[in-house]
Amino acid sequence: MEFENKEVVNRPLVSVIIPIYNVGTTIYRMIECLEQQTFQMFELILVNDGSTDESEEICKTIIRNHQNYYLYSKENQGAFSARNLGIEKANGAYLTFLDADDKIDSNYLEILFHNCMGTDIAVCDVAVYKEDTEISRFTGGNQKITQTQALNKLLVRKEINSGPCGKMFSQKIIEEVRFPFLRVYEDILFVLECFCKVREITVTDKTTYYYMQEDTGTMGRMAKSPSVDIIAATEKIMDFIADRRDLSEECTYITISHLYQYALPVAIQNNYRGCEFILKTQILYRKYMEQILKCKAMPWKEKVIFYLYAHGYVYTNKFIKKIQR
């Protein structure tokens, strides 16, 4: 179902895409950020992904007051599906993605737009906040970097965050790229594919995207209901790294370590009994064991931990636990 407040007469320079799912308490904050932008030649595409709260009604109210705001509603499938619909509906020469519960600087669109014009992709600082405190920041200064440099920074989770937010893409780059059908980890695969379509990327610290971290821990939620989508995504990333001889070995180390950060809590939550997530993770570690053992960036202690896990044992608190079938 579509709710539009006017026909598109003139093509906007930028399309801003926001997936909407039960964000009735935070959406106005992001709308206020957009209203305060120094750059106003944009359209806003809100995609309601089957919200069960008042989000859709709030969005209908919002678009009535803005001629360049549009709302599309669909059944719940996940952020990947909502963003893909947003891409299909976008009319801008450039696209950027926001999340409804985050914040941006008032010069966010202006800075990214001007930096994106020369290289087709622009990346800005991303500050991670918990409540009112900044707990980390991705920052790469002001520079143009090569595709290889950008991929390395993305995959080692340094300077460039893994998600689509904090970035702007030209429409010609994103035209044939879509978010994969995964509930989690779909964002880094999307960004990875976009980065592979350009020779250079512009990085700027002149504006900031503020990621507002939830109070509830992602790892805790993941341990209770693990998603095998993480395993599928990790496999794609590992294959990508193996095919690219120009990438740092740290990319392998970080990718494998990041998966283990999910696998260990799942094993503990299940009292060291095997479940689908654990068994499939073990298969992945065995599949890439040669890459793991040859990785010069990975400490030997962690290689041993991953080897043990691949063969049914978990190392935790100086004890080795056998995973029960």
Over which residues does each language-model region extend?
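Short aromatic/hydrophobic "clamp" motif used to bind/position activated sugar donors
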Residues: L95
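A conserved acidic beta->alpha catalytic loop
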Residues: C33, N48-I58
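Donor-binding/catalytic cores of nucleotide-activated saccharide
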Residues: A79-F80, A100-T202, Y211-P226, P299
